[in-house]
């Protein structure tokens, strides 16, 4: 929805999640839209042929390359960055080993090794802090 607003296909909205499926269909020339529960379901529906096309995160296509065709990658200037934040929380029930292991995991996530793993699964790690 945000990409369609930014591309000028839909009118600006304070909350793009409130843009109806009907509005999107009309902006796309009246195509039938099947809104699935989440992007994983959309990806599966396209892969099995229940839907002809779908809009999903690139990372959700991993492992389905032989069953789907990527028609277009929408640029970040239309969508904005998709950020998956991580933080270590204060947990009074965690012992010292659990707390230090959690910190090690968070520290690992910002290493080059972790970036390589994320990139393997189609996550873009070229974002600004």
Which residues fall in each region the model found?
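Exported/periplasmic ABC-transporter solute-binding proteins
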Residues: 1-129
